[in-house]
Amino acid sequence: MNISDVAKKTGLTSKAIRFYEEKGLVTPPLRSENGYRTYTQKHLNELTLLRQARQVGFNLEECGELVNLFNDPRRHSADVKKRTLEKVAEIERHISELQSMRDQLLALAESCPGDDSADCPIIDNLSGCCHHKAQKPR
């Protein structure tokens, strides 16, 4: 198979395939007599694994580890499961951080009248200035 065939079958671009090759994330393809890359089913499997692993949040280094496990006949499913659960824990931490950010933003938005006034509690709060302005006695 040539690179365009592999791109169609994996859903990756030719550029992405070459990038993964340059990074050493896939087995180097053989070259035909005219210098074109020649791919096998193994390449398709590695590239599909990379695409799908990236889609669920694995970074390039982690993808490389997964490809290495894929190619290791002595691998243990426990190793793959461990990496997967570590990724789940990382995603849960990110979700928690995002929820905290959301809550902070909602609190800021609630503090702002959102009118034509130049006074903006959101800007004041984010800049650290005038945070006592709203608490001045009248």
Curated annotation (Swiss-Prot):
<dbReference type="InterPro" id="IPR000551">
    <property type="entry name" value="MerR-type_HTH_dom"/>
</dbReference>
<dbReference type="GO" id="GO:0045893">
    <property type="term" value="P:positive regulation of DNA-templated transcription"/>
</dbReference>
<dbReference type="Pfam" id="PF13411">
    <property type="entry name" value="MerR_1"/>
</dbReference>
<keyword id="KW-0186">Copper</keyword>
<keyword id="KW-0963">Cytoplasm</keyword>
<feature type="binding site">
    <location>
        <position position="112"/>
    </location>
    <ligand>
        <name>Cu(+)</name>
    </ligand>
</feature>
<dbReference type="GO" id="GO:0003677">
    <property type="term" value="F:DNA binding"/>
</dbReference>
<keyword id="KW-0805">Transcription regulation</keyword>
<feature type="DNA-binding region" description="H-T-H motif">
    <location>
        <begin position="4"/>
        <end position="23"/>
    </location>
</feature>
<keyword id="KW-0010">Activator</keyword>
<keyword id="KW-0804">Transcription</keyword>
<keyword id="KW-0479">Metal-binding</keyword>
<dbReference type="InterPro" id="IPR047057">
    <property type="entry name" value="MerR_fam"/>
</dbReference>
<comment type="subunit">
    <text>Homodimer.</text>
</comment>
<dbReference type="GO" id="GO:0005737">
    <property type="term" value="C:cytoplasm"/>
</dbReference>
<dbReference type="InterPro" id="IPR011789">
    <property type="entry name" value="CueR"/>
</dbReference>
<protein>
    <recommendedName>
        <fullName>HTH-type transcriptional regulator CueR</fullName>
    </recommendedName>
</protein>
<keyword id="KW-0238">DNA-binding</keyword>
<dbReference type="GO" id="GO:0005507">
    <property type="term" value="F:copper ion binding"/>
</dbReference>
<comment type="function">
    <text>Regulates the transcription of the copA and cuiD (cueO) genes. Detects cytoplasmic copper stress and activates transcription in response to increasing copper concentrations.</text>
</comment>
<dbReference type="GO" id="GO:0003700">
    <property type="term" value="F:DNA-binding transcription factor activity"/>
</dbReference>
<feature type="domain" description="HTH merR-type">
    <location>
        <begin position="1"/>
        <end position="69"/>
    </location>
</feature>
<feature type="binding site">
    <location>
        <position position="120"/>
    </location>
    <ligand>
        <name>Cu(+)</name>
    </ligand>
</feature>
<dbReference type="InterPro" id="IPR009061">
    <property type="entry name" value="DNA-bd_dom_put_sf"/>
</dbReference>
